[in-house]
Amino acid sequence: MSYMEIRNLKKVYNPYGVHPKVALNGLDFEVEKGDFICIMGASGSGKTTLVNILSTIDEATHGQILLNQKDLLLLSEKEKANLRKEEIGFIFQNYNLIESLTIKNNILFSLRLNNVDKKTQLEKLMPLAKMLNIDEIIDKYPSQCSGGQQQRAAIARALINEPKIIFADEPTGNLDSLNARELMEYFVKINEEKHTTIIMVTHDSFVASYSKKVYYMKDGHLDLFIDRNTKSQDDYYKEIVKVTTQMHL
């Protein structure tokens, strides 16, 4: 049984207007528990729209999204909020940090909402902050930090709850190559050891080579699929580069 099933998923912006825009055009695919999926495609192909809908941030026009056999499109706003709090981690292009809170308090925000004790908060915070190289800036405010530091803080905030599924939209976009590699290695670690399911959008073929599967989107539908299977990361990377080049991405 699949962890997540997407059936005939459609998204149309301005559906009753003069110029409706079809962002997703009848997608069908399945996500297994412990999958690490990368979604690639040209700008405007529907990648971010898909991730936003799967993570309940946006709503579909038509279709089904079954998570553990529960249709996300039929959930109430309260049920969606509880799902996001308990199971889902978000890493998006916009940091969405709270300017009036320190980096530390931004990261710990969800734990405090769940009344996690202070000792446990710190036990979760410090290893994550060190891994992301932000342990020395946790007492600063977002405005005092660089874009890369803010991105890493947003990543820590998403991971600290140990979510069952992570949605990441260009998570390495503001990171240098070293921090990008370390983040991807951490994704692989939690994917393999904790079976955390990851669905990630990226334009970077090297970042994509850390995943298990790559889907290519074009004009709102899934156009091509690559499965790593037993390939080495290097061979997988070369295949991704080849397909990406052929698609002129």
Predicted regions and their residues:
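A short, flexible loop at the N-terminus of ABC-type nucleotide-binding domains that lies
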Residues: Y3, V12-G26
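Helix-to-loop junction immediately C-terminal to a conserved catalytic motif
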Residues: S55
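Conserved ABC transporter NBD signature motif
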Residues: G63-D71
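Short coil-to-helix segment of the ABC ATPase nucleotide-binding domain corresponding to the Q-loop/switch region
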Residues: L101-F109
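Conserved ABC ATPase signature
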Residues: Y141-C145, Q149-Q151
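A short, proline-enriched helix->beta-strand linker immediately N-terminal to the Walker B motif
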Residues: I160-K164
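Catalytic Walker B motif of ABC-type/P-loop ATPase nucleotide-binding domains
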Residues: I166-D169
